[in-house]
Swiss-Prot record:
Example of a GO MF term: nucleotide binding
Source organism per UniProt: Streptococcus pneumoniae serotype 4 (strain ATCC BAA-334 / TIGR4)
InterPro entries per the UniProt record, alphabetical: Glyco_trans_8, Glycosyltrans_8_dom-fam, Nucleotide-diphossugar_trans
Name used for this protein in its record: Glycosyltransferase GlyF
Residues where Mn(2+) binds: 101, 103, 221
Domain of life: Bacteria
Name of the coding gene: glyF
Segments for region (GT8 domain): 1-259
Length: 398
């Protein structure tokens, strides 16, 4: 079965757009892509189309006049091209079409989604508590499964265009508001795996959230301004977006790639972490330089100073600013050592949590957060950082 997928983007969004396409084609074949756009160069389509032939897929540019929507109000971090999705059912030759935003990755097969019974509805989507105008129910428009015949039968595109012309300046979330106002309760709710919105993690830093690394949702949506290509985005599965971004077309053709970011980037299994409120972390850069076989995870529940973020230049360092509180637990699970070497207060009782997790805990004499010597596997003079280096070099892992 061939699958029709529509995306909308502008020239500035080419890299995210191509990443979405790569992710789809790594897991699916026989796909016809339709890209609604006003300014993407034809050369891009011609070259990409040649690459897609090996997976029996096609891509087509569908030009939309941006003047139709350029003056329309949109939601935050969204531009006029978001309104292009209204035309999705007009450009395909199939009975069913899937619309996807370009801040999405697909991690599995889509045949099951395409075969869902829409139960007489014109559209299937995933619930979104932020859907529109402060309503507590509605759907997110980043993924829309549409019955083409019903859209044409009811002239839905014309109705949406008329509604948008009337209300685009008063709605809060642009095209998403318009679609929700039009369909109201007349849509089929689909399982959240088909539009799992990790992008909203940024609004729920302290809320417990599910770890998704080993079993990612079928469609991952980096909704919100916190995109994975931002330098320090906090969303879950940020690294997975970069894996799909990194895929070359031979890997897509043969489906033989390692999609584990940490294996792909050759990250050491020797992992050490610390959580801090302060940029004053004793001998941190020295330790990073002297221990290249260790990967340092530096987390902070706040914005990080340049002093800390600059350490990202080292391949054995990852910085997490405004860290998800749940990620602290995940980092503890994966780490061997916790370093209590930052000045200032302890963050979220993390030293005790590290002990309860069975981690080795090392500290300098002037940075230790507890006077209980039994909490630590080593307390070192801040004047002798090489003693800590030597201790860590002697740690073996299975």
């Amino acid at each position: 079965m061939r699958k029709s997928i529509v995306l909308a983007a502008d020239n500035a969004y080419l890299i995210p757009l191509e990443t979405t396409i790569k992710s789809v084609l790594y897991h699916n074949r026989d796909v016809d892509f339709y890209i609604l756009n006003s300014d993407i160069a034809p050369e891009w389509f011609k070259l990409l189309g040649r690459k897609m032939e090996v997976v029996n897929s096609t891509i087509r540019s569908v030009h939309i006049d941006k003047e139709l929507f350029e003056s329309y109000k949109t939601g935050p971090h969204i531009n006029y091209a978001s309104y292009f999705r209204f035309f999705a059912t007009e450009v395909v030759e199939s009975d069913r079409v899937l619309y996807l935003d370009s801040d999405i990755i697909v991690t599995g097969e889509l045949a099951t989604l395409f075969e869902i019974d829409l139960k007489g509805y014109s559209i299937g989507a995933v619930d979104d508590v932020y859907a529109y105008e402060g309503r507590k129910s509605g759907f997110n428009t980043g993924m829309l499964l549409m019955d083409v015949a019903k859209w044409k039968e009811h002239s839905i595109v014309n109705s949406l265009l008329e509604l948008a012309a009337e209300q685009n300046q008063v709605v809060h979330l642009g095209d998403q508001s318009i679609l929700n106002i039009y369909f109201e309760d007349n849509w089929l709710a689909l399982d959240k795996t088909y539009n799992y919105m990790v992008g909203i993690d940024i609004y729920h830093l302290a809320q417990e959230c599910e770890r998704l690394d080993d079993n990612p949702p079928t469609i991952v949506h980096y909704a919100s301004h916190d995109k994975p290509w931002n330098t320090y985005s906090i969303s879950r599965l940020r690294e997975l977006w970069w894996v799909y971004r990194d895929l070359d077309w031979s890997e897509i053709a043969f489906q033989r790639s390692d999609l584990n970011y940490f294996e792909r980037s050759n990250q050491s299994k020797k992992q050490v972490m610390l959580v801090t409120w302060s940029a004053d972390i004793k001998h941190l850069e020295y330790l990073v330089q002297r221990l290249p076989d260790w990967h340092f995870h530096l987390a902070a529940p706040c914005d990080c100073s340049e002093e800390l973020t600059s350490l990202s230049q080292y391949t054995n360092v990852t910085v997490y600013q405004n860290v998800l509180h749940s990620r602290i637990d995940w980092l503890l699970d994966d780490s061997i050592v916790y370093l209590d070497i930052n000045t200032g207060g302890e963050v979220f009782n993390v030293v005790t949590r590290a002990q309860e997790s069975g981690k080795k805990i090392f500290a300098f004499d002037i940075t230790r957060k507890s006077m209980d010597d039994g909490l630590y596997d080593g307390i070192f003079s801040v004047e002798r950082p090489d003693d800590l280096v030597d201790r860590m070099k002697n740690i073996e892992i299975e």
